[in-house]
Amino acid sequence: FKNIERLWKQEYINYLRLTTDTAFNVLKKKNQLRFDTLIQHIKKVKEEIAPKQNLVWSNYLDSIFLEDQLLRRKWQKAANAYGYSSNEAQKYWPEIHLKDSLNLIAVTNFINNYGWQSKEVVGQTGNSTLFLVIQHSDSATQEKYLPILKKAVKQNKASPGDLALLLDRLSVAKYGYQIYGSQVHEDTATKKTVFFPIKNEKKVDKRRKKMKLQPLSEYGRLFGITYKPIE
């Protein structure tokens, strides 16, 4: 239910899928009244913002978002329980990579044909999908679409936070350090989740604030990391 409430607040309007996909049956059985109430809220949001959006595009990108996240959530659950390098977590990666390659074809074709569309046109979830699929691609593809994302941020069509995450991903791959502290990994010795090295770490929260990201201590808690800012 929390995920549905989050999607509603982000103007998720794939109402048809929410009401017909059997994957949501477990929530209906758990609390039919609460599910119906949330669906009505989502329907209302859809009716209010639909005239502003391209529903074909938003529904298309929403479906890609679900495919991108479904296996990753299963992987994250296994990683939290057994560790990132465990067989229980690693078994998901072949299928994740396959999904990523298919989603990348779809999203790059979309961007090449229609540009980096704003949340006003494709919804918050659709807009996030464009970033997530590029973020989950290879470095060459990330480099190729980085200028397009930078331009989209300047035009208020994309989130500065998304740009920060992509820049960090590229920086870690190239240099082994990051700028905004968004990238984490499992320490091979302690098996704990830690941040990749952060360049000029004393000023990381100032840089994060400029990109509209929460303080690193708050972000770290999402991964079970206790972070104390450097004085």
Predicted regions and their residues:
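Preference for long, solvent-exposed alpha-helical segments and helix-linker "stalks"
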Residues: 1-126, 136-140
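Mature extracellular/secreted ectodomains of secretory-pathway proteins
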Residues: 108-172, 177-179, 183
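Beta-strand-rich cores of mature extracytoplasmic or soluble domains
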Residues: 14, 23-26, 176-190
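Short secondary-structure transition/capping segments
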Residues: 29, 228-231
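Extended, non-catalytic structural segments that build the interaction scaffolds
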Residues: 89-92, 189-196
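Solvent-exposed, polar/charged alpha-helical surfaces in well-ordered, non-transmembrane soluble domains
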Residues: 25, 105-109, 147, 202-209
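Amphipathic alpha-helical packing elements
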Residues: 167-172, 176, 180, 185, ...
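Short acidic alpha-helix initiation/capping motifs at coil-to-helix transition points
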Residues: 18, 140-142, 196-201
